[in-house]
Amino acid sequence: MKIAQSALGEIQAHGAEGYPHEICGIMLGPRGEGRVTEVRRARNIIVERARDRYEIDPRDHIRIQKEADAMDYDIVGYYHSHPDHPAQASRFDTERAWPGYVYLIVSIQEGKPVDANCFVADKDGGPFNPEPLVVA
């Protein structure tokens, strides 16, 4: 997946600001291009396990989808952080995956972003396959 440096920087900053909790958001790009040029933060509605779980607030998802449509943008995928864990998909992440989207995970170690990886699923619930991350 191609992502603008500014978009990746925003994801990393969001992860650092949200530490030690998981943060989440949506990645957008010009319709049909499959590249990420902008991101939108979303609320994590899993409060009781925010340290190791996330779920995007459905109201944020709808609002961001409407915004993307108005801009003639696609939702390219979703991002979230793993506080003090590697940027690798958990079983929980994989089970909740939808095909057709890219999932970016950023590792935040002691409040600082250290790594990011992308994954795609061929069908609902995975399995996840690695997707190259190209910062351009």
Regions found by a protein language model. Give the residues of each.
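Conserved, mostly hydrophobic/aromatic
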Residues: 78
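Conserved beta-strand-loop surface patch within small alpha/beta domains used
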Residues: 1-75, 83-136
